[in-house]
UniProtKB/Swiss-Prot annotation:
Keywords: NAD, Oxidoreductase, Tricarboxylic acid cycle. InterPro entries: L-lactate/malate_DH, Lactate/malate_DH_C, Lactate/malate_DH_N, Lactate_DH/Glyco_Ohase_4_C, Malate_DH_type1, Malate_DH_type1_bac, NAD(P)-bd_dom_sf. It comes from Serratia proteamaculans (strain 568). Catalyzes the reversible oxidation of malate to oxaloacetate. It holds the Pfam family Ldh_1_N. It comes from the Bacteria. PANTHER family: MALATE AND LACTATE DEHYDROGENASE (PTHR11540), MALATE DEHYDROGENASE, MITOCHONDRIAL (PTHR11540:SF16). GO terms for cellular component: cytoplasm. This is Malate dehydrogenase. The active site is at 177 (proton acceptor). Belongs to the LDH/MDH superfamily. MDH type 1 family.
Length: 312
C-alpha cells in the first residue's frame, strides 16, 4: 500500500507524515511531496524512526515522481489561515494549487483514492471533481473531503462537557467543513443528553473551533497538529478498508445522491474501492433540521464556486 502526502513540508503535512510513518501497516510505502526544498530532508528525518514503512521525499514543481503507484493521495498543500481570515479567504491561492496537483494525480495515479485537506474543503473538493471529470477519470467513490477534524473536535468537546472518555464517543458530523455548514448530530450520541442551551453552545464551538486555534496561535499558524491527527485517522481507516477490513466507518465530504447538495459530509462505510456505502444521516432533532436547512444555501454557493473555477 502506497500513500502519498502532497504538501508534506507544511504544518499539517509534517504532522500527518509523522503519524503515518509510525502507524501505517508494515511494508507500506510513504511518499512525501512539497514545493519546498526541505521535503527530501523531512523524509530522511522520518526515515530514522524504526518502523517498516519505506519513505521517500520529493520537492520542486513536479509532484509526479511522488505519485507513481500511489493507492492513497492526501493533499494538504496550500496557505494556512491567519487571524481575521475565514476558510473562504484561502480560495484565491489554494484553488490553483489543488487544480494543479489533481491534474498530476489524474495523469499519474488516476485510480488512487484522494483525500483533500486543503481549505476551503467545501470548494476544493468540487474543483478536484471537475478536474478529474475533464480528464475522464472521475470516480465519486474515490474522492473525499477530509472532515475528520470536525469529528475529533466534537468527540473532545462533548467528552469535556459530559465527563466522558473521548475515545468512547463518535459524534457524526454532516454538511460541509466550514462555519455553519459544520453540523454535529449531538442528538445521535447514545446515552448522552443535552439541554437546548448546551446544544446551541456546543454546535457553535465546534463550528468555530478552527478560529479558536488561529486566534490562540496569535498569528503563528492555524490548526496543524490536530488536523494532522484527524487526517491520519482518515488515511489509516482508508488503508485498512482498501486492504479488505470490513465495517470501517468514517465521516467525509463526498459526492452522493444530491439530496441536500452535490457534495455532502456524512457517515460512510469504506471498502476496497473507496466508498462502499453512504449511510443515512438518520433522524435529526428540530434544532439540527433547522441548521441543515439554513446551511444549504451557503454549501451550494461554495460548491458552485469550485465548479465555476474549472469550467469558466
Amino acid at each position: 500500500m502506497k500513500v502519498a502526502v502532497l504538501g508534506a513540508a507544511g504544518g499539517i503535512g509534517q504532522a500527518l507524515a509523522l503519524l503515518l510513518k509510525t502507524q501505517l501497516p508494515s511494508g507500506s510505502e510513504l511518499s512525501l511531496y512539497d514545493i519546498a526544498p526541505v521535503t527530501p530532508g523531512v523524509a530522511v528525518d522520518l526515515s530514522h524512526i524504526p518502523t517498516a514503512v519505506k519513505i521517500k521525499g520529493f520537492s520542486g514543481e513536479d509532484a509526479t515522481p511522488a505519485l507513481h503507484g500511489a493507492d492513497v493521495v492526501l493533499i494538504s498543500a496550500g496557505v494556512a489561515r491567519k487571524p481575521g481570515m475565514d476558510r473562504s479567504d484561502l480560495f484565491n491561492v489554494n484553488a490553483g494549487i489543488v487544480r494543479n496537483l489533481i491534474q498530476q494525480v489524474a495523469t499519474t495515479c488516476p485510480k488512487a483514492c484522494i483525500g483533500i485537506i486543503t481549505n476551503p474543503v467545501n470548494t476544493t473538493v468540487a474543483i478536484a471533481a471537475e478536474v478529474l471529470k475533464k480528464a475522464g477519470v472521475y470516480d465519486k467513490n474515490k474522492l473525499f473531503g477530509v472532515t475528520s477534524l470536525d469529528i475529533i473536535r466534537s468527540n473532545t468537546f462533548v467528552a469535556e462537557l459530559k465527563g466522558k472518555q473521548p475515545e468512547e464517543l463518535n459524534v457524526p458530523v454532516i454538511g460541509g467543513h466550514s462555519g455553519v455548514t459544520i453540523l454535529p448530530l449531538l442528538s445521535q450520541i447514545p446515552g448522552v443528553s443535552f439541554t437546548d442551551q448546551e446544544v446551541a453552545d456546543l454546535t457553535k464551538r465546534i463550528q468555530n473551533a478552527g478560529t479558536e486555534v488561529v486566534e490562540a496561535k496569535a498569528g503563528g499558524g492555524s490548526a496543524t497538529l490536530s488536523m494532522g491527527q484527524a487526517a491520519a485517522r482518515f488515511g489509516l481507516s482508508l488503508v485498512r478498508a482498501l486492504q479488505g477490513e470490513k465495517g470501517v466507518v468514517e465521516c467525509a465530504y463526498v459526492e452522493g445522491d444530491g439530496k441536500y447538495a452535490r457534495f455532502f459530509a456524512q457517515p460512510l462505510v469504506l471498502g476496497k474501492n473507496g466508498v462502499e456505502e453512504r449511510k443515512d444521516i438518520g433522524t435529526l432533532s428540530a434544532f439540527e433540521q433547522k441548521a441543515l436547512d439554513d446551511m444549504l444555501d451557503v454549501l451550494h454557493k461554495d460548491i458552485e464556486l469550485g465548479e465555476k473555477f474549472i469550467n469558466n
